[in-house]
Amino acid sequence: MENIGRQRPIGVFDSGIGGLTNVRALMERLPMENIIYFGDTARVPYGTKSKATIENFSMQIVDFLLGHDVKAMVIACNTIAAVAGRKIRQKTGNMPVLDVISAGAKAALATTRNNKIGIIATNTTVNSNAYARAIHRDNPDTLVRTQAAPLLVPLVEEGWLEHEVTRLTVCEYLKPLLADGIDTLVLGCTHFPLLKPLIGREAHNVALVDSAITTAEETARVLAQEGLLDTGNNNPDYRFYVSDIPLKFRTIGERFLGRTMEQIEMVSLG
């Protein structure tokens, strides 16, 4: 019975497809784990919606994943983590629930040497102040500078990862953060890890914190601690569920995932 518990999947969810960067990191860090992903592509973006609506949509996704008997959940969406994280944890009880903000904040504090941390994220995540709160809970003396970088999302989805337009946009967003002397930068949006090489060149003396990688590390640590790591599965099952299959979804999704998406299924929630 214990082994069956370990074989249960990890549930990962996002408001769209950006969370596939988290799935990619989990596949690389935990190659024997079964994974179920849900992206609410019919109702993205969440950032423009009210707190009550975001909580309602999130609860529907959590119910869906609980119906698939997941052993842990990863909130692979900064907006959901900032707005509905507490409510999700109340609903799931003792189940391990990881999120990109908590993991990113923890990694940033472990990385910085001068106690000056920058965050680039979407408008909603910046306005929520969730990263600063998470960092200041552990170290109130840390300087946290946030910068909304909304234009990077469509550029990533367009595939312009090394385009001059993207480079210039990154430079503009980095200017105020670099002027404040940050030595650590959190990539606070699930799209941004794809721009890590470009951002690294433009902020070459700054350590980059990839929330997807740090969340995968934290997931591995918690599963091991709870005795839930699957160590005997050489043929893991990956399932991808979405609420809509928009134009170019597979192309963009596979760019985020770094491999082909074989099992995509559309489901309707709510």
Curated annotation (Swiss-Prot):
Reported function: Provides the (R)-glutamate required for cell wall biosynthesis.
Alphabetical list of NCBIfam families matching this protein: glut_race
E.C. no: 5.1.1.3
One biological process term in Gene Ontology: regulation of cell shape
Keyword Protein biosynthesis included in the entry's annotation: no
Domain of life: Bacteria
Annotated residues for binding of substrate: D14, S15, Y46, G47, N78, T79, T190, H191
EC class (word): isomerase
Protein's recorded name: Glutamate racemase
GO MF term (any one): glutamate racemase activity
Family of the protein in this entry: Belongs to the aspartate/glutamate racemases family.
Active-site positions on this chain: C77, C189
Keywords: Cell shape, Cell wall biogenesis/degradation, Isomerase, Peptidoglycan synthesis
Pfam families: Asp_Glu_race
Pathway: Cell wall biogenesis; peptidoglycan biosynthesis
HAMAP family: Glu_racemase (MF_00258)
Reaction catalysed by this enzyme: L-glutamate = D-glutamate
Keyword ATP-binding attributed: no
